[in-house]
Regions:
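Stable alpha-helical elements in mature extracytoplasmic
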Residues: 2-6, 34, 38-41, 78, ...
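Loop/turn elements at helix/coil->beta-strand transitions in domains of secreted/extracellular proteins
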Residues: 15-20, 47-52, 103-106, 143-147, ...
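N-terminal active-site segment of His-dependent metallophosphoesterases
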Residues: 98-163
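Extended active-site neighborhood of metal-dependent phosphoesterases/phosphodiesterases
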Residues: 160-274, 299-309, 323-359, 369
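Active-site segments of SGNH/GDSL-like serine hydrolases
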Residues: 9-36, 180, 279-288
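Catalytic His-Asp segment of secreted/periplasmic serine-dependent ester chemistry enzymes
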Residues: 26-97, 333
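Active-site neighborhood of phospho(di)ester-bond hydrolases with catalytic His/Asp-centered motifs
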Residues: 109-111, 148-153, 176-182, 218, ...
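Solvent-exposed loop/turn segments at secondary-structure junctions
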Residues: 26-30, 58-61, 113-116, 154-157, ...
């Protein structure tokens, strides 16, 4: 901010009492300068006799700092702006007028913490996941997030593994959600039915809404060899489903059952009618083709493609991560936290026209444009 410092020096040395406003944009998307909302904000500031420099005005958040009662400091993704003298007039107006119609909110996403007290196996560092999760939670708590979701396989095995990592996850300062993974049910048969409640879940599958966006959390263990005791009817039904549908996918995957599929369709119909945008979460991927995919991935995809409100499907399970786009829907597999000594998680910011994935550790940064 050399220009800012120069103007401050001129003002201080001359004693001139002149209104001014200087901003420096360190980030902007090519083409932003033509955005009508930005142009409107700039024009309105000029009408007030305030010069605004820098295109990235749509993500400002105000924070009064007051140097001798006169200063105000604004900061946002890529913009630092300082105003003197006009602070009282400019600051509340600017925060109100430049509130982004593009940037909506952000959320944290984690996949496959997969903690247990066992020794490492290959690249999987099971016991280290507690430390990684703690580091992740500390970082996420330093951001203004609407919620955080863990995308399944919170533990690797053993019911008492929850005792170690749940308190860490529950120390998040924002709502914290779970999707169920196959390893979450790698516990003694007597504990399997208690897993969702132990994880603090409102149901095995559910939905919630944030600022015009509908989030649908699916249970890919609905039809499963992992989620039910071996002597249960559900386990037997999984065997029938697997044989009758001639599934070649590994048995550690699962399927979204018929009742849940009908529920999902109803939620999507409601979201479409209300003009909401939708992101789905599940432990298991559905696209691109992969051995980790849901048994009924094709069925799920065909339903999602019926609805223009569906923008993304985000999952875990495949620790290497993966990405694909099909018919305007983004399919994002996040990398598993349990893998290697390095961490992996992300903060995803929701904008009107894109999703921005900020990867931490091994996770990849991405821009997912919305149609």
């Amino acid at each position: 901010l050399e220009k800012t410092q120069l103007i401050e020096r001129i003002r201080d040395e001359t004693g001139w009492d002149i209104p001014w406003f200087v901003a420096q944009a360190t980030y902007h998307v090519p083409g932003d300068e033509s955005d009508p909302n930005i142009r409107a904000a700039q024009a309105a500031l000029w009408e007030k006799g305030v010069a605004l420099e820098g295109p990235d005005t749509d993500q400002l958040k105000g924070n009064l700092r007051g140097r001798n009662g006169q200063g105000v400091h604004f900061s946002g993704p890529g913009l630092h702006a300082h105003a003197k003298e006009w602070a009282e007039k400019v600051s509340p107006w600017l925060v109100q007028k430049t509130k982004s119609v593009k940037y909506k909110f952000s959320f944290g996403a984690i996949a496959d913490c997969q903690y247990c007290r066992g020794p490492n196996r290959g690249s999987r560092h099971y016991a280290s996941s507690a430390k990684k999760l703690h580091q992740c939670v500390q970082e996420l708590n330093s951001h203004d997030l609407e919620f955080v979701i863990h995308l399944g396989d919170f533990i690797d095995r053993d019911y008492d593994s929850f005792d170690k990592v749940l308190p860490i996850y529950q120390s998040l300062k924002m709502p914290a959600y779970h999707a169920l993974g196959n390893h979450d049910f790698d516990v003694a048969d007597k504990w399997k039915a208690k897993v969702p409640e132990r994880m603090g879940m409102q149901g095995r599958y559910y939905d919630f809404k944030v600022e015009g966006w509908r989030f649908i959390v699916l249970d890919g263990n609905d039809v499963s060899f992992h989620a039910y005791p071996k002597d249960s009817l559900e386990y037997q039904n999984a065997g029938v489903y697997y044989r009758e549908n001639k599934i070649s996918s590994p048995k550690w995957n699962g399927a979204v059952g018929g009742k849940q599929v009908a529920w999902m369709r109803k939620i999507l119909e409601t979201a479409e009618a209300k003009g909401e945008k939708v992101i789905l979460y599940c432990h298991f991927p559905v696209y691109p083709a992969d051995p980790h995919n849901l048994w009924n991935a094709k069925e799920v995809i065909s339903i999602l493609e019926e609805f223009s409100c569906v923008k993304a499907y985000i999952n875990g399970h495949n620790h290497k991560g993966k990405y694909g786009q099909k018919d305007g829907i983004h399919y994002l597999t996040l990398k598993g936290m349990v893998e290697t000594e390095d961490n992996a998680y992300s903060i995803i910011s929701v904008h009107q026209d894109e999703l921005k994935v900020k990867g931490y550790g091994r996770e990849t940064d991405r821009r997912l444009l919305l149609k």
